Amino acid sequence: MKERKKKYVALWQVMQRECRRLVSRPLYLFCMVIAPLFCYLFFTTLMDSGLPQNLPAGVVDMDDSSTSRNIVRNLDAFSQTGVVAHYSNVTDARIAVQEGKIYGFFYIPKGLSAEAQSQRQPKISFYTNYSYLIAGSLLFRDMKMMGELTAGSAARSVLYAKGATEDQAMGFLQPIVIDTHPLNNPWLNYSVYLCNTLIPGVLMLLIFMVTVYSIGVEIKDRTAREWLRMSNNSIYIALAGKLLPHTVVFFIMGIFYNVYLYGFLHFPCNSGIFPMIFATLCLVLASQCCGIVMIGTLPTLRLGLSFASLWGVISFSISGFSFPVMAMNPVLQGKCRKPYR
């Protein structure tokens, strides 16, 4: 009984010692409170609208007819596309894309209206800059849709001229109606997709770094013997007493981001808030365990922090966040089954 009481006393003393160290170094306050809060607000406000709106695009209208002007107006009506400039030729539009003034341009050839009415299949072209993946993809989608709508409108006019009714024309143009239902993120909101991964990922990375630093600085400052002696020469009590205050702080920060995302911003959460909070607690504990392994593998502060930062950054990529796991190399797919993420 006395031995157990000594363990509890030693654990409490180590926790008190660690709390004093936490409040004595501003670095802990920054990494455990200020940096997570900044990342929460930064990422959620950066993508506040969900999808980029009014991406700058250009138009090269060589036809300059009522039909071509109507096409340009309809293209500008898309929420993701904003027609900001008209160019007299393709060369000027290409230079504007290369200079970053626009992300793409829509080319309407001369004689479009006349060739469409005479059924000579005029060609509409559009060019998007895929160096910017999201902007290029959104503009490509809108311009492709505009091209399909233009072709459908021309075909519908021909069918009307041949005496077809509206139902007959629409049945010919679209024999099968597609009804799409995106699951879990029906708004196709980039903020929902990115913040659900980035925010816990950043928190995980900070836990790695703080755990490695808090143990590594004991080795660097030669206070590890004092720390171990205070814990009754038990490495388990030493680690538990040192990391429990960190666990409490990081868990509170985890609860905050869950309430912020799913309660305040109303992100979709099919499981409910309490399973997510429990998963956050598991994330905090697992990240601290990884931090212990990192500083134990490379027991110097510099190498331990380098290991933690490298592992954390690689975890983003290999978890399938930026590239689908099923499309990776089979060797990497096997590694994704392991708890890198």
Language model features with spans:
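Membrane-helix interfacial "entry" motifs
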Residues: 17, 21-24, 185-194, 230-242, ...
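Membrane-interfacial segments
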Residues: 46, 50-51, 159, 215-223, ...
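Residue-level recognition of pore/gate-forming positions within transmembrane alpha-helices
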Residues: 36-37, 145, 201, 246, ...
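Short helix-terminus and kink motifs of transmembrane alpha helices
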Residues: 106, 141, 209-217, 222, ...
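Membrane-spanning alpha-helical segments of multipass transporters and channels
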Residues: 43, 64, 95, 248, ...
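Hydrophobic alpha-helical transmembrane segments of multi-pass membrane transport proteins
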Residues: 38-41, 181-261
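Extracytoplasmic/periplasmic domains immediately adjacent to an N-terminal transmembrane anchor
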Residues: 1-192
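Alpha-helical transmembrane segments of integral membrane proteins
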Residues: 9-12, 27-31, 192-196, 200, ...
